[in-house]
A protein has these predicted regions:
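A mature extracytoplasmic/lumenal domain signature
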Residues: 98, 173, 194-198, 228-230, ...
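...with weaker cross-activation on analogous glycine-rich loops/strands in unrelated enzymes
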Residues: 158, 162, 172-195, 199
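A short acidic/basic microdomain associated with nuclease active sites
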Residues: 83-84, 167-170
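Noncatalytic regulatory segments and standalone regulatory/sensor domains
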Residues: 204-211, 215-218, 224-269
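Short, basic, glycine/proline-bearing loop/turn elements
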Residues: 160-167, 211
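Active-site-adjacent structural segments surrounding the nucleophilic cysteine of cysteine proteases
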Residues: 2-4, 12-22, 26-155, 162, ...
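Structural recognition of the beta-strand scaffold that forms the well-ordered cores
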Residues: 93, 168-169, 189-194, 225, ...
């Protein structure tokens, strides 16, 4: 009897130990599974936060000018801009008058003659300067030549330096006309270089510069502001400082824009 009971007791003890061991293993498995799930969830959340932060950072650091130039170009868009006329005061001042048009549109109450007198870099011609460096002559003189985009950018920056409400100024020369349309589509009129009535320019050598290069001036050189376009009608709307608010054929406008070096100046926020 005693031997039988002793054997049963040993079997019972063994079963109990096995049962306890199984419970421990099962519990450990549950704990490990829970920890893995917790870490996995944390990693997913962390990755999501990191992606979101990266996207927000990229958006915050993207150049505003790049955003404007890469904007969508719908089939048509028009900005209500009133043209400022250059005559009679500034017979050759189409460039500074075009800048005046854009500044007036943005709420700056400035006069074209004020800009010409106090902000436009002017030099006499003859070889020391080019139209990329200064206005050659004076816009009050009908025999003066004019200037190109960098000079108008410089005048705009000088003016902005004295204003409490400032805008950015960019020489966007070299960009395609489609980029110019992108600016207009987002509400930004653009100063561009063209010719009077879109005449075909002819290049005349005026003098030889000190470094031996020849200075060539394009006949009919002109500057205006594009404030609208319509691809369906093949037209562009411009503020022409000689003609006022005018409509030109788009194909011809684009052709002359390229021939004049795809020059443009943008004021933007």
């Amino acid at each position: 009897m005693d031997n039988h009971k002793s054997g049963s007791k040993k079997k019972n003890n063994g079963s109990c130990l096995l049962f306890v061991l199984l419970i421990i293993i099962f519990a450990a498995a549950i704990v490990l599974a829970w920890k893995f799930r917790d870490k996995s969830g944390t990693a997913d959340v962390s990755a999501t936060v990191q992606i979101t932060q990266t996207t927000e950072t990229e958006s915050e650091t993207k150049d505003p000018l790049e955003i404007i130039l890469s904007g969508d170009v719908p089939s048509s868009h028009n900005i209500n801009v009133e043209a400022v006329l250059q005559n009679p005061e500034l017979p050759t001042g189409c460039e500074i008058t075009s800048l005046t048009t854009v500044l007036n549109y943005w709420g700056y109450n400035v006069d074209k003659c004020d800009l010409a007198d106090n902000y436009l870099h002017k030099e006499s011609g003859g070889g020391e300067y080019t139209m990329y460096e200064a206005f050659l002559g004076t816009p009050y003189d009908s025999n003066a030549l004019g200037c190109y985009a960098p000079v108008i950018k410089d005048a705009a920056e000088k003016y902005m330096a004295r204003q409490s409400k400032k805008m950015q100024v960019a020489d966007i020369s070299g960009n395609s006309v489609e980029k110019v349309y992108a600016c207009v589509a987002q509400g930004y009129p653009v100063v561009i270089w063209s010719t009077m009535n879109l005449h075909e320019p002819s290049w005349t050598t005026y003098w030889t510069n000190e470094d031996g290069t020849k200075f060539e001036f394009p006949s009919y050189e002109h500057c205006m502001v594009i404030n609208g376009y319509n691809k369906n009608d093949n037209t562009v709307e411009v503020c022409d400082p000689m003609e006022g608010n005018t409509t030109y054929e788009m194909d011809r406008f684009e052709e002359i824009y390229k021939e004049m070096g795809s020059q443009a100046v943008l004021l933007y926020k």
